[in-house]
């Protein structure tokens, strides 16, 4: 099984970048890597009633992905880091998505 360290190394991203709190603009990009957003939401620590509320309130999958990440960031505040997001992708079995998301995080942090 891949670790966050493995993913960061494969993506060419320093681990200290992943320890940062997720910014809103990068969260919008990371939503693209949440193909199975309900599974990822569970791994991010959202409760079933929170997931159901997002699912019921919004129509499109894209809106649901963004809302789920917004809910996670709101709930976890400074603990909503890129590292935690990559861990959730890995726990959901989304290794390639984790690598691609890590690359996007690295690209955003270099600006």
Where are these regions (language model features)?
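Alpha-helical death-domain superfamily interaction modules
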Residues: 6-29, 36-111
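Eukaryotic interaction-scaffold segments
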Residues: 1-5
């Amino acid at each position: 099984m891949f670790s966050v360290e493995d993913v960061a190394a494969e993506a060419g991203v320093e681990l200290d970048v992943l320890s940062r709190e997720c910014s809103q603009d990068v969260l919008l990009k990371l939503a693209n890597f949440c193909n199975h957003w309900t599974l990822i939401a569970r791994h991010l620590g959202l409760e079933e009633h929170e997931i159901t509320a997002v699912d019921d309130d919004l129509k499109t999958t894209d809106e649901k992905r963004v809302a789920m990440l917004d809910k996670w960031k709101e709930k976890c505040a400074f603990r909503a880091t890129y590292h935690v997001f990559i861990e959730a992708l890995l726990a959901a079995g989304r290794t390639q998505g984790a690598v691609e998301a890590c690359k996007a995080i690295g690209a955003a942090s270099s600006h």
